[in-house]
Amino acid sequence: MLPIAIFIIGPTASGKTNLAIKLRQKLPVEIISVDSALIYRGMDIGTAKPNHEELTQAPHRLINICDPAESYSTANFCLDALNEMTVITAAGRIPLLVGGTMLYFKSLLHGLSPLPPANVEIRTLIQREAKAVGWAALHQKLKKIDLVAANRIHPNDSYRLLRALEVFLVSGNTLTEMIQKSGNALKYQVYQFAIMPVNRSLLHDRITRRFHQMLANGFEYEVSQLFARTDLNTNMSSIRCVGYRQMWSYLAGETNYHEMIFRAISATRKLAKHQITWLKSWQNICWLDSEQQDMALNKILQMISKHIS
């Protein structure tokens, strides 16, 4: 019989952390963070990282494991998460994976697609071409190579455009073809739960309120500490995190304060929309209303308790 694991997946600002902490008080679970922003040290406010009290009450694994200058791939996550899950299961407890980085969840669940590593030489060639003809022209080029990927990638999303073209030039296979080749499936009996408000406007309101609270909590100072470093720039995954790249742009004098706020909130809403789109196509998942936390908690307990008694 396979060991049990629980996934709580949801868009940003949907109340995942709060639900996970409540669940830890009821079940023998250990929390593993599934969030590509929470891995970074010194990036606490803008990532809505659980505070000291919450982490004392319910420790989260895979938080604060990287410096913002370090790279951390999906493959790194899968290896780290599997290691933590093995340790937790061996201790007779249940891994509870919580977060909103959908690619991490998907890769862990179905196995990592064998994508080629980044190739500096190829990337430089693509970036030179983009500088000469523009990213919109490269998006049209991608349409001829991989229409499925091109339809998923916005013409202004230079990072994902670059990666899709790079994969093709390095491997000779399209990104879509490579993604369809999955590795080994997760050897756990996984119970998956999606949490979000029934009404999308509630999520938008929560995102807006949360960002203003981040500002009140010292988000500008937090980013200014990163901005002052000489080893960080906007090409890095850490600084591309939602909120950070907009504040970075403000600190660089590229936009004013009010525009920064507008862009950060808009980008966060866009991220939430993207996360929800992923979830809508997710298989074998139980939906929970984030505005009914006690009901959501009871639903999880009902499903899990009969399998651990």
From Swiss-Prot:
Complex and partners: Monomer.
Function noted in UniProt: Catalyzes the transfer of a dimethylallyl group onto the adenine at position 37 in tRNAs that read codons beginning with uridine, leading to the formation of N6-(dimethylallyl)adenosine (i(6)A).
Residues binding ATP, per UniProt: 10-17
Transmembrane segments: none
Origin: domain of life: Bacteria
EC number(s) per entry: 2.5.1.75
Keywords: ATP-binding, Magnesium, Nucleotide-binding, Transferase, tRNA processing
Cross-referenced InterPro entries: Dimethylallyltransferase, IPT, P-loop_NTPase
Gene label: miaA
GO molecular function annotation: ATP binding; tRNA dimethylallyltransferase activity
EC top class, as a word: transferase
Entry keyword annotation includes Protein biosynthesis: no
Family designation: Belongs to the IPP transferase family.
Cofactor: Mg(2+)
The protein, known as: tRNA dimethylallyltransferase
Catalysis: reaction(s): adenosine(37) in tRNA + dimethylallyl diphosphate = N(6)-dimethylallyladenosine(37) in tRNA + diphosphate
Residues given in the record as substrate binding sites: 12-17
Site (Interaction with substrate tRNA): 101, 123
Alphabetical GO biological process terms: tRNA modification
Residue segments, region Interaction with substrate tRNA: 35-38, 240-245
Pfam families: IPPT
Source organism of this protein record: Baumannia cicadellinicola subsp. Homalodisca coagulata
